[in-house]
UniProtKB/Swiss-Prot annotation:
Function: NDH-1 shuttles electrons from NADH, via FMN and iron-sulfur (Fe-S) centers, to quinones in the respiratory chain. The immediate electron acceptor for the enzyme in this species is believed to be ubiquinone. Couples the redox reaction to proton translocation (for every two electrons transferred, four hydrogen ions are translocated across the cytoplasmic membrane), and thus conserves the redox energy in a proton gradient.
Protein encoded by which gene: nuoA
Lineage, opening ranks: Bacteria, Pseudomonadati, Pseudomonadota, Betaproteobacteria, Nitrosomonadales
Membrane topology: Multi-pass membrane protein
Subunit annotation: NDH-1 is composed of 14 different subunits. Subunits NuoA, H, J, K, L, M, N constitute the membrane sector of the complex.
Family named by the database record: Belongs to the complex I subunit 3 family.
Superkingdom of the source species: Bacteria
Keywords in alphabetical order: Cell inner membrane, Cell membrane, Membrane, NAD, Quinone, Translocase, Transmembrane, Transmembrane helix, Transport, Ubiquinone
Catalytic reaction equation(s): a quinone + NADH + 5 H(+)(in) = a quinol + NAD(+) + 4 H(+)(out)
GO cellular component, one term: NADH dehydrogenase complex
GO molecular function terms attached to this record: NADH dehydrogenase (ubiquinone) activity; NADH:ubiquinone reductase (non-electrogenic) activity; quinone binding
Keyword Transport: yes
Protein's name in the database: NADH-quinone oxidoreductase subunit A
Length: 122
C-alpha cells in the first residue's frame, strides 16, 4: 500500500526536481558563460539617464507600508471569496453565515481604519 501511494506521488516529485534542475542549471550557465567585466559605468546607479539625485537609501513614509498591508489584507479577502463562491451550494447555510461573519469583521476593520484616518494623506 505504501509503495502504491509513493508511486502516485512520483510524477509530482519528478516535476519538482526537473523544475529545480532547470532553474539551477540556467543560473549556473549564465554565471559561467556571461562575461564579467565591471567598470565604473556598469557599477554606477541608473536613474532615467541622469545621475542619482539622492541616496538610494532614503526613508519612506510609513503610510506607504500601511497602504501595502491594507492592500494585501483586502486582496486576501478576495482570494477567500472565490473558492467560497464556487462551493457555496455544498457548504450550505453554515458556510454562508461563516463567510458573512468574516466579511463583517473586514468591514468593521475597514470602517475603523477610515475613522482613524489611516487612509488620509494629509
Amino acid at each position: 500500500m505504501l509503495n502504491t501511494m509513493l508511486g502516485n506521488y512520483f510524477p509530482i516529485l519528478l516535476f519538482i526536481l526537473v523544475g529545480l534542475a532547470i532553474g539551477v542549471l540556467s543560473m549556473l550557465a549564465g554565471w559561467l558563460l556571461a562575461p564579467n567585466k565591471p567598470d565604473a559605468e556598469k557599477l554606477s546607479p541608473y536613474e532615467c539617464g541622469f545621475g542619482a539625485f539622492e541616496d538610494a537609501r532614503m526613508k519612506f513614509d510609513v503610510r506607504y507600508y500601511l497602504i501595502a498591508i491594507l492592500f494585501i489584507l483586502f486582496d486576501l479577502e478576495i482570494a477567500f471569496l472565490f473558492p467560497w463562491a464556487v462551493v457555496l451550494k455544498e457548504i450550505g447555510w453554515f458556510g454562508f453565515v461563516a463567510m458573512l461573519v468574516f466579511l463583517g469583521l473586514l468591514v468593521v476593520g475597514f470602517i475603523y481604519e477610515w475613522v482613524k484616518g489611516a487612509l488620509e494623506w494629509d
